Amino acid sequence: MSSDLKQLNKLKKNSRRNNQLQEPKFVERLIKISRVSKVTKGGKKLSFRAIVVLGDENGKVGVGVAKADDVVNAFKKAKTDGRKNLITLPLTKSLSIPHDTVGQFGACKIIMKPAIEGSGVIAGGAVRIVLEVAGVKNVIAKQLGSNNLLNNARAAISGLEQLTTKTEVEKRRNS
């Protein structure tokens, strides 16, 4: 009986350590760091804005944006913001998307279509980074409207959010 209590206490004592070990590893990719300034009465105050995409390369992806006085802190804050905005998307066996989708954000419009195995990620700019970090290996994407990196990344995320599987469609139709 006492040995069981000791094991239980060990588990409780090391619970924080165990939680950190089980946390999934995320891949972080920096889209852009820009220098921004705020004009005040005393002059211009410079800071940095970081746009980061992070995902587990297995169907989870998020975009984070943050500002800070230096680049390192902006990057860290953007990573935490990206973790708050994670979405999960369904992937097919060929690591493609299940169907065509269109994502919009602001003036940006992203058209994504599934591709056959071996074709790779055919996309440009921020959309390519979002798809690679999400774990999509075979897809064709086209950017329309704007070249803004942040808006294109968010449009890609909104398009990926709309993806559904066959079972989800069946459930929706049956109920």
Where are the model-predicted features located?
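Ribosome-associated RNA-binding proteins
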Residues: 1-175
